[in-house]
Amino acid sequence: MSMVYINIFLAFTLSFMGLLIYRSHLMSSLLCLEGMMLSLFVLMTVTILSNHFTLASMAPIILLVFAACEAALGLSLLVMVSNTYGTDYVQNLNLLQC
């Protein structure tokens, strides 16, 4: 396993650990999700380029499209929650708390 793959795996792991640790605020959770998507994009791109997979060359672009959609939905949810409650706590998203 080369150092590039180890660094990408470490970036994904740190983003995932940040998602688990800083899950009280929605903005920090969204940033950790974006870090995870970025490391997956770099991992897919490096793997495709190093193994010369020409048929799978669109996969990183498709992942970026899904990451952009996820970011847009997350930011719209963040704006809605912050306008409604005044904070960006994830606990405000509980539907059982009418």
UniProtKB/Swiss-Prot annotation:
Protein's cellular compartments: Mitochondrion inner membrane
Protein family according to the UniProt entry: Belongs to the complex I subunit 4L family.
Biological role stated in the UniProt entry: Core subunit of the mitochondrial membrane respiratory chain NADH dehydrogenase (Complex I) which catalyzes electron transfer from NADH through the respiratory chain, using ubiquinone as an electron acceptor. Part of the enzyme membrane arm which is embedded in the lipid bilayer and involved in proton translocation.
InterPro entries: NADH_UbQ_OxRdtase_chain4L/K, NUOK/Mnh_C1-like
Reactions mediated catalytically: a ubiquinone + NADH + 5 H(+)(in) = a ubiquinol + NAD(+) + 4 H(+)(out)
Record organism: Taxidea taxus
Main location: mitochondrion
EC number of the protein: 7.1.1.2
Biological process terms in GO annotation: ATP synthesis coupled electron transport
Record keyword Electron transport present: yes
GO-annotated molecular function: NADH dehydrogenase (ubiquinone) activity
The protein, known as: NADH-ubiquinone oxidoreductase chain 4L
Domain of life: Eukaryota
Subunit structure: Core subunit of respiratory chain NADH dehydrogenase (Complex I) which is composed of 45 different subunits.
Membrane topology (UniProt): Multi-pass membrane protein
Keyword field: Electron transport, Membrane, Mitochondrion, Mitochondrion inner membrane, NAD, Respiratory chain, Translocase, Transmembrane, Transmembrane helix, Transport, Ubiquinone
